[in-house]
């Protein structure tokens, strides 16, 4: 496993995490659990059964999207958003416990859309135009990225490394960022990388690419870790 961060200006804590992951490669694993609500029932169920907490806790940022159109949202969407509100408080608590963070963002489309507009079927937002400077789609993309950067900045200020996994499951067409194909999704990822490392200097992020498709790979210079979402039947 490569231990040199793809961001040449990455904070030392980023390299420390990558070094540790390299040291345990082939020898052990880190357990993790994704959560989405303030109650985090999954985490406490794990502790109830094992007496321990996982090493990694995943946090969902969907409610932090700036373009949530509540007037178009159904009851299920509103419930999901409301239950997710404030979960970054739990992320800070996890930091105080010494755990590792990973963030996922079901990003409501930057303009337009209705209901759960992170789904492609709920928006006409064109990801292929979002990477073209000067387009309304690009301006909206930058606006949302600035908004999220403000949320991430306090973690950067305290040198808290984050496994940052944007545009997840980009191999599929179900999210707006994957609807125009894996190459467009990869370009979105590269755009975010450049914007966050060169403009916002979020040097605490560990960049995680999430797709099994080689044709959609962003390149080693933009990615620290390759991941994949797998679902099994209950």
Where would I find each of the regions flagged by the language model?
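Solvent-exposed loop/turn segments at secondary-structure junctions
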Residues: 36-38, 62-65, 108-111, 168-172, ...
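Substrate-binding cleft of extracellular glycoside hydrolase catalytic domains
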Residues: 67-191, 198, 202
